[in-house]
């Protein structure tokens, strides 16, 4: 399902839009004939990050400040920058931890936007330093390993970067 979610996000991004509020309520799953299909809904916080093939600049501000569902929004959204491709993919990582992989986000019981932002920044710094202990604490069993590789790729993205969606999808391929 992670691969389908990346594919759906890629489709949205291909039109120059970011979703800005990925959460479990905004991801519908349908099973028919043994085939699982995933759909992203609720485009109320969608943003146009690309106009005439020019990416919006990274400009923190009040326009988009903390918009979205607090436990899942990206650092970009916390500081008020227009959500970009990187933002949606970070958002997806937190969503996967809490929803698909049955983990617990360290900031889920924090109140206030600033403490949540600081906790996310700390987690991202540990991921960037290749310390997987932060994800081990969030997630049961071995499921953190693939997500750790995914989150490394995401935290290494610059605001305007176009992600390598194929590589991100391959992280979640099931070994046969």
Show where each model-derived region lies.
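Conserved hydrophobic alpha-helix
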Residues: 5-12
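Conserved C-lobe activation region of Hanks-type protein kinase-like domains
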Residues: 32, 75-140
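Catalytic-loop of the protein kinase fold
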Residues: 13-31
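Activation segment signature within eukaryotic-like protein kinase domains
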Residues: 1-2
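Activation segment/activation loop of eukaryotic-type protein kinase catalytic domains
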Residues: 30-67
């Amino acid at each position: 399902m992670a691969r389908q979610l990346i594919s759906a996000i890629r489709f949205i991004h291909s039109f120059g839009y970011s979703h800005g509020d990925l959460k479990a309520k905004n991801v519908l799953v349908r099973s028919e004939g043994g085939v699982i299909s995933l759909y992203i809904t609720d485009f109320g916080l969608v943003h146009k990050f690309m106009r005439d093939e020019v990416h919006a600049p990274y400009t923190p501000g009040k326009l988009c400040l903390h918009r979205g569902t607090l436990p899942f929004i990206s650092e970009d959204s916390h500081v008020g920058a227009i959500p970009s491709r990187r933002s949606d993919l970070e958002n997806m990582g937190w969503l996967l931890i809490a929803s698909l992989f049955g983990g617990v986000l360290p900031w889920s019981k924090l109140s206030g936007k600033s403490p949540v932002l600081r906790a996310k920044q700390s987690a991202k710094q540990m991921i960037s330093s290749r310390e997987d202990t932060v994800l081990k604490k969030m997630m049961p069993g071995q499921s953190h390993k693939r997500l750790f590789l995914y989150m490394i790729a995401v935290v290494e993205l610059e605001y305007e970067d176009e992600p390598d969606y194929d590589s991100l999808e391959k992280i979640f391929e099931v070994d046969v």
